[in-house]
Amino acid sequence: MSLVPYVIEQTSRGERSYDIYSRLLKDRVIFLGEEVNDTTASLVVAQLLFLESEDPDKDIYLYINSPGGSITSGMAIYDTMQYVKPDVSTICIGMAASMGSFLLTAGAPGKRFALPNSEIMIHQPLGGFKGQATDIGIHAQRILEIKKKLNSIYSERTGKPIEVIEKDTDRDHFLSAEEAKEYGLIDEVITKH
């Protein structure tokens, strides 16, 4: 069971209580602090769309501390980040691994950040399939296509040649915040808001 803190605000009309995530949303902050799956993707996508409808010209801030997760769920978030009119600024706090690092890199150019002790990890897609040989072959082909697509996007967003991305994502590749900046996954290491 997850504990969600509440914030109490004083207004001229009395007190108002918010769960912390709703209060952050008021300031255009979305927090992805767990595995990327269908549920978390639906929540993040809904928040992105809501914030766009509230003010299409004001930046959205997506804070990421995630071990990664589902590719299709992550791609739903990625596509929505690119679709909405406001720039989406990404900030890594703690760890952005796998799909978490992909989403970190998907932030608006010049607005991708990490705190100094953050860790970023990139790798190729994971898959585990069982069944008939023909079905396993279909899934293997699909994961190779996904790998190619993800590597292409990483290459485009980092400015690294596709061959470098392919080599570096062949196995788990861990980077400090400073290394992620040099690599092109983020734009700046920040210490203050």
Curated annotation (Swiss-Prot):
The active site is formed by 98 (nucleophile), 123
| Record text on subunit structure and interactions | Fourteen ClpP subunits assemble into 2 heptameric rings which stack back to back to give a disk-like structure with a central cavity, resembling the structure of eukaryotic proteasomes.
**Could you tell me where this protein is found in the cell?**
Cytoplasm
Recorded catalytic activity of this chain's protein: Hydrolysis of proteins to small peptides in the presence of ATP and magnesium. alpha-casein is the usual test substrate. In the absence of ATP, only oligopeptides shorter than five residues are hydrolyzed (such as succinyl-Leu-Tyr-|-NHMec, and Leu-Tyr-Leu-|-Tyr-Trp, in which cleavage of the -Tyr-|-Leu- and -Tyr-|-Trp bonds also occurs)
Xref: CDD domains: S14_ClpP_2
Homology family: Belongs to the peptidase S14 family.
- Identify the SUPFAM superfamilies for this entry: ClpP/crotonase
Q: NCBIfam families given for it? A: clpP, PRK00277.1, PRK12553.1
Its protein name is ATP-dependent Clp protease proteolytic subunit
Recorded source organism is Clostridium acetobutylicum (strain ATCC 824 / DSM 792 / JCM 1419 / IAM 19013 / LMG 5710 / NBRC 13948 / NRRL B-527 / VKM B-1787 / 2291 / W)
Keywords carried by this UniProt record: Cytoplasm, Hydrolase, Protease, Serine protease
Q: What does this protein do?
A: Cleaves peptides in various proteins in a process that requires ATP hydrolysis. Has a chymotrypsin-like activity. Plays a major role in the degradation of misfolded proteins.
- Tell me the gene name: clpP
Q: Give Gene Ontology CC terms.
A: cytoplasm; endopeptidase Clp complex
As one GO molecular function, the record gives: serine-type endopeptidase activity
Which Enzyme Commission numbers does its entry carry?
Answer: 3.4.21.92
| Pfam families membership | CLP_protease (PF00574)
GO terms in the biological process aspect are: protein quality control for misfolded or incompletely synthesized proteins
